[in-house]
Protein backbone atom coordinates (compact mmCIF):
# COMPACT_ATOMS: atom_id res chain seq x y z
CA UNK A 1 0.00 0.00 0.00
CA UNK A 2 1.14 3.50 -0.78
CA UNK A 3 1.50 5.87 2.12
CA UNK A 4 -0.17 9.20 1.58
CA UNK A 5 2.22 12.05 2.37
CA UNK A 6 0.46 14.80 4.26
CA UNK A 7 1.78 18.30 3.82
CA UNK A 8 1.91 20.80 6.68
CA UNK A 9 -1.13 23.01 7.22
CA UNK A 10 1.12 26.07 7.50
CA UNK A 11 4.57 26.72 6.05
CA UNK A 12 6.50 29.82 7.14
CA UNK A 13 9.92 31.40 6.83
CA UNK A 14 11.98 34.57 6.97
CA UNK A 15 11.45 38.00 5.42
CA UNK A 16 14.01 40.29 3.78
CA UNK A 17 13.39 44.06 3.97
CA UNK A 18 13.87 45.93 0.69
CA UNK A 19 13.68 49.57 -0.44
CA UNK A 20 11.44 50.93 -3.22
CA UNK A 21 14.00 49.82 -5.84
CA UNK A 22 14.11 46.27 -4.47
CA UNK A 23 17.57 46.60 -2.89
CA UNK A 24 18.08 44.53 0.24
CA UNK A 25 18.20 46.48 3.49
CA UNK A 26 18.73 43.36 5.58
CA UNK A 27 16.54 40.90 7.38
CA UNK A 28 13.38 41.75 9.29
CA UNK A 29 14.07 42.67 12.93
CA UNK A 30 11.75 39.98 14.31
CA UNK A 31 13.15 36.58 13.32
CA UNK A 32 10.67 33.78 12.68
CA UNK A 33 10.62 31.50 15.73
CA UNK A 34 11.85 27.93 15.41
CA UNK A 35 8.42 26.66 16.46
CA UNK A 36 5.29 28.67 15.77
CA UNK A 37 1.83 28.38 17.35
CA UNK A 38 -1.13 30.75 17.53
CA UNK A 39 0.06 31.70 21.02
CA UNK A 40 3.40 32.84 19.54
CA UNK A 41 1.61 35.85 18.03
CA UNK A 42 1.10 37.26 21.54
CA UNK A 43 4.59 38.66 20.99
CA UNK A 44 3.48 40.53 17.87
CA UNK A 45 3.53 39.74 14.16
CA UNK A 46 6.43 37.28 14.39
CA UNK A 47 6.05 36.15 10.79
CA UNK A 48 5.02 38.48 7.95
CA UNK A 49 1.94 37.16 6.20
CA UNK A 50 3.96 37.33 2.97
CA UNK A 51 6.22 34.61 4.45
CA UNK A 52 3.28 32.56 5.77
CA UNK A 53 1.59 29.98 3.53
CA UNK A 54 -1.58 28.21 4.66
CA UNK A 55 -3.57 25.34 3.20
CA UNK A 56 -6.80 26.68 1.74
CA UNK A 57 -8.84 24.20 3.82
CA UNK A 58 -7.90 25.95 7.07
CA UNK A 59 -7.60 29.53 5.79
CA UNK A 60 -10.54 31.81 6.60
CA UNK A 61 -11.39 34.90 4.61
CA UNK A 62 -9.71 38.11 5.77
CA UNK A 63 -11.78 40.01 8.33
CA UNK A 64 -12.28 43.26 6.44
CA UNK A 65 -13.39 45.03 9.63
CA UNK A 66 -9.66 45.33 10.29
CA UNK A 67 -8.17 47.80 7.84
CA UNK A 68 -4.52 47.36 8.87
CA UNK A 69 -4.29 44.15 10.90
CA UNK A 70 -6.46 41.68 8.99
CA UNK A 71 -3.26 39.74 8.21
CA UNK A 72 -2.44 39.41 11.93
CA UNK A 73 -5.95 38.14 12.70
CA UNK A 74 -5.83 35.79 9.68
CA UNK A 75 -2.48 34.24 10.70
CA UNK A 76 -3.74 33.59 14.23
CA UNK A 77 -6.89 31.92 12.88
CA UNK A 78 -4.86 29.74 10.49
CA UNK A 79 -2.51 28.67 13.27
CA UNK A 80 -5.41 27.86 15.61
CA UNK A 81 -6.86 25.56 12.93
CA UNK A 82 -3.56 23.91 11.96
CA UNK A 83 -2.20 20.60 13.15
CA UNK A 84 1.17 20.60 11.36
CA UNK A 85 3.33 23.72 11.05
CA UNK A 86 6.69 23.77 9.27
CA UNK A 87 9.51 26.34 9.45
CA UNK A 88 11.35 26.37 6.12
CA UNK A 89 14.20 28.50 7.56
CA UNK A 90 14.29 30.14 4.11
CA UNK A 91 13.62 33.70 2.96
CA UNK A 92 10.12 33.42 1.50
CA UNK A 93 9.44 37.08 0.74
CA UNK A 94 10.85 40.53 0.22
CA UNK A 95 8.96 43.18 2.20
CA UNK A 96 8.91 46.87 1.32
CA UNK A 97 10.41 48.88 4.19
CA UNK A 98 7.44 51.22 4.49
CA UNK A 99 4.31 49.10 4.21
CA UNK A 100 0.76 50.30 4.89
CA UNK A 101 0.85 49.54 8.63
CA UNK A 102 4.27 51.20 8.97
CA UNK A 103 2.90 54.43 7.50
CA UNK A 104 -0.24 54.21 9.68
CA UNK A 105 1.56 52.96 12.80
CA UNK A 106 -0.79 54.45 15.44
CA UNK A 107 -3.99 53.10 13.85
CA UNK A 108 -2.27 49.77 13.21
CA UNK A 109 -1.23 49.44 16.87
CA UNK A 110 -4.79 50.20 18.00
CA UNK A 111 -6.21 47.50 15.72
CA UNK A 112 -3.56 44.98 16.78
CA UNK A 113 -4.47 45.70 20.42
CA UNK A 114 -8.13 44.86 19.61
CA UNK A 115 -7.16 41.60 17.90
CA UNK A 116 -4.89 40.62 20.77
CA UNK A 117 -7.64 41.28 23.33
CA UNK A 118 -9.95 39.03 21.29
CA UNK A 119 -7.55 36.05 21.37
CA UNK A 120 -5.36 36.56 24.44
CA UNK A 121 -7.48 38.57 26.89
CA UNK A 122 -7.26 42.19 27.99
CA UNK A 123 -4.91 41.83 31.01
CA UNK A 124 -2.23 39.84 29.18
CA UNK A 125 -2.52 42.20 26.19
CA UNK A 126 -1.90 45.26 28.38
CA UNK A 127 1.12 43.58 30.01
CA UNK A 128 2.49 42.48 26.64
CA UNK A 129 2.20 46.02 25.26
CA UNK A 130 4.42 47.22 28.11
CA UNK A 131 7.00 44.68 26.93
CA UNK A 132 6.57 45.80 23.29
CA UNK A 133 7.40 49.38 24.31
CA UNK A 134 10.59 48.23 26.08
CA UNK A 135 11.58 46.08 23.09
CA UNK A 136 10.87 48.91 20.63
CA UNK A 137 12.94 51.52 22.49
CA UNK A 138 15.76 49.08 23.14
CA UNK A 139 16.00 48.38 19.39
CA UNK A 140 15.77 52.09 18.60
CA UNK A 141 18.33 53.32 21.14
CA UNK A 142 20.86 50.50 21.20
CA UNK A 143 20.62 48.93 17.79
CA UNK A 144 19.59 51.95 15.75
CA UNK A 145 16.65 50.24 14.10
CA UNK A 146 12.94 49.84 14.50
What are these regions (language model features)?
Residues 117-146:
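Membrane-proximal basic amphipathic "stem/tether" segments
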Residues 1-25:
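Conserved donor NDP-sugar-binding/catalytic core segment of glycosyltransferases
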Residues 9-11, 88-90, 124-128:
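A short coil-to-beta-strand element that immediately follows conserved catalytic motifs
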Residues 55-56, 112, 135, 140:
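Basic side chains
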Residues 13, 19, 26-107, 111:
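Conserved nucleotide-sugar donor-binding catalytic segment
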